[in-house]
Amino acid sequence: MSLLTEVETYVLPTRNEWECRCSGSSDPLVVASSIIGILHLILWILDRLFFKCIYRRLKYGLKRGPSTEGVPESMREEYRQEQQSAVDVDDGHFVNIELE
């Protein structure tokens, strides 16, 4: 039997056979798993959108960064520039390295 014959004789399932058998189910396990799945998806999307803010908050707590009390202003500015450059590098996920 050739491949063409097999394709021609294959019978597609009717629409009723394709439908999900658990749609409209009031089974508590199905409802709970659906809610957990939706919450997981929402949290994952929020994590991807705001991961820098979230993890920076976890790292430094509610403060904006490490304490600069008693540190001269010039050193504070240098530290801010270092932190900003580290964040800027993270934006692209790639770092260009030039070999001389």
From Swiss-Prot:
It is a single-pass type III membrane protein. GO terms for biological process: protein complex oligomerization; symbiont genome entry into host cell via pore formation in plasma membrane; symbiont-mediated suppression of host autophagy. The record marks H40 as: Essential for channel activity, possibly by being protonated during channel activation, and by forming the channel gate and the selective filter. It holds the Pfam family Flu_M2. Residues 63-86 are annotated as: Disordered. Residues 47-100 are intravirion. Residues 1-25 are virion surface. One of its GO terms (molecular function) is monoatomic ion channel activity. The record marks W44 as: Seems to be involved in pH gating. Gene3D superfamilies: 6.10.250.1640. InterPro entries: Flu_M2. The chain crosses the membrane at residues 26-46. Keywords: Disulfide bond, Host cell membrane, Host membrane, Host-virus interaction, Hydrogen ion transport, Inhibition of host autophagy by virus, Ion channel, Ion transport, Lipoprotein, Membrane, Palmitate, Phosphoprotein, Signal-anchor, Transmembrane, Transmembrane helix, Transport, Viral ion channel, Virion. One of its GO terms (cellular component) is host cell plasma membrane. A lipid is attached at C53 (S-palmitoyl cysteine). It is found in: Virion membrane; Host apical cell membrane. The modification Phosphoserine is found at S67, S85. The M2 protein from most influenza A strains is inhibited by amantadine and rimantadine, resulting in viral uncoating incapacity. Emergence of amantadine-resistant variants is usually rapid. Homotetramer; composed of two disulfide-linked dimers held together by non-covalent interactions. May interact with matrix protein 1. When the channel is activated, one or more imidazole moieties of His-40 probably become bi-protonated. Forms a proton-selective ion channel that is necessary for the efficient release of the viral genome during virus entry. After attaching to the cell surface, the virion enters the cell by endocytosis. Acidification of the endosome triggers M2 ion channel activity. Cytoplasmic tail plays an important role in virion assembly and morphogenesis. Belongs to the influenza viruses matrix protein M2 family. This is Matrix protein 2. The lineage of its organism: Viruses, Riboviria, Orthornavirae, Negarnaviricota, Polyploviricotina. The gene is M.
